[in-house]
């Protein structure tokens, strides 16, 4: 067990170093609520975000970017063909697609669109809260709009089903994060109880997952670890959600190898 934990820590630390060296470009088809938060988080960590929504530029963008993040948070029927075209271009250029199925299960449109995107992607990582993961697997979860009422543990079976169905990695985010891959599952116990009170925190995790995928860490582990540790550090310096939002950017920017290793809680 310790050997596996040590190996995972090395993977996380190495991925962060590589990301900061390479500064990968990440194409984000994101939502209006999350765009500013996710772009700033990517910049703070060392990646380069571009918020691209036009079909007319998507083929070109995916030819030189490192990964594609598709976030359905403010879904509109006009966006769906663009999202699917972007996934098609990512497939052509062998780029990883990170799907954030925001509110999957809250409406039939969100659920059907999430299924379409998951089925279309060749190299896929799914990042969602427990209720979204459960709904994406075709089960009935408990949600309140885009917020999960299910525990991360309750979604493990659904995550394994998605992993096997789409040959992908699945990140379940919540009070406890789980990474589910062909190699098994990893549990992360970092983060802070204040984090859910800042909008787009999950969207930020999806964006960071795309950045790490662009440099070869294609499980979501490094992104979840880095955001969890940075969230803890930021919360210690914050009086509430407003200051947490700002302090998180500083924590991502300042996060170093020693602090990351010291604070990681993996099992």
Swiss-Prot record:
Q: Which SUPFAM superfamilies match?
A: Ribokinase-like
Q: Please give the Gene Ontology molecular function terms for this protein.
A: ATP binding; hydroxyethylthiazole kinase activity; magnesium ion binding
Q: Which of the seven top EC classes does this enzyme belong to?
A: transferase
Task: Supply the EC number(s).
Answer: 2.7.1.50
Q: Known catalysed reaction(s)?
A: 5-(2-hydroxyethyl)-4-methylthiazole + ATP = 4-methyl-5-(2-phosphooxyethyl)-thiazole + ADP + H(+)
What keywords are assigned to this protein? ATP-binding, Kinase, Magnesium, Metal-binding, Nucleotide-binding, Thiamine biosynthesis, Transferase
Q: Which domain of life is it from?
A: Bacteria
UniProt pathway: Cofactor biosynthesis; thiamine diphosphate biosynthesis; 4-methyl-5-(2-phosphoethyl)-thiazole from 5-(2-hydroxyethyl)-4-methylthiazole: step 1/1
Which Pfam families does the entry mention? Answer: HK (PF02110)
Question: Is Transferase given among the entry's keywords?
Answer: yes
Q: Give the residues the record marks as binding substrate.
A: 51, 200
Keyword match Iron: no
Binding residues annotated for ATP, in chain numbering:
127, 173
Q: Name one GO biological process term.
A: thiamine biosynthetic process
**Required co-factors:** Mg(2+)
The similarity comment for this entry is:
Belongs to the Thz kinase family.
* Function of the molecule: Catalyzes the phosphorylation of the hydroxyl group of 4-methyl-5-beta-hydroxyethylthiazole (THZ).
Q: What is this protein called?
A: Hydroxyethylthiazole kinase
Q: Which organism is it from?
A: Psychromonas ingrahamii (strain DSM 17664 / CCUG 51855 / 37)
What taxonomic lineage is listed for the species of origin? Bacteria, Pseudomonadati, Pseudomonadota, Gammaproteobacteria, Alteromonadales
């Amino acid at each position: 067990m310790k050997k596996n934990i040590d190996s995972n820590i090395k993977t996380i630390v190495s991925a962060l170093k590589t990301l900061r060296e390479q500064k990968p470009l990440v194409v984000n088809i994101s939502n209006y609520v999350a765009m500013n938060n996710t772009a700033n988080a990517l910049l703070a960590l060392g990646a380069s975000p571009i918020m691209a929504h036009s079909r007319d530029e998507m083929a070109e963008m995916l030819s030189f970017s490192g990964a594609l993040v598709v976030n359905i948070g403010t879904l509109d029927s006009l966006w769906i063909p663009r999202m699917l075209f972007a996934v098609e271009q990512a497939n052509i250029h062998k780029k990883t697609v990170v799907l954030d199925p925001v509110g999957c299960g809250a409406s039939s449109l969100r659920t059907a669109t999430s299924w379409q995107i998951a089925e279309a992607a060749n190299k896929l990582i799914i990042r969602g809260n427990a209720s979204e993961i459960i709904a994406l697997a075709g089960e009935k979860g408990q949600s309140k709009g885009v917020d999960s009422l299910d525990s991360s543990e309750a979604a493990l079976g659904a995550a394994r089903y998605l992993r096997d169905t789409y040959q992908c990695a699945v990140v379940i985010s919540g009070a406890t994060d789980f990474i589910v891959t062909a190699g098994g599952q990893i549990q992360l116990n970092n983060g802070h109880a204040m984090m859910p009170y800042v909008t787009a925190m999950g969207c930020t995790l999806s964006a960071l997952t795309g950045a790490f995928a662009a440099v070869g860490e294609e499980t979501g582990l490094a992104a979840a670890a880095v955001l969890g540790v940075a969230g803890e550090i930021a919360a210690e310096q914050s009086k509430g959600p407003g200051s947490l939002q700002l302090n998180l950017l500083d924590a991502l920017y300042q996060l170093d190898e020693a602090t990351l290793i010291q604070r990681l809680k993996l099992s």
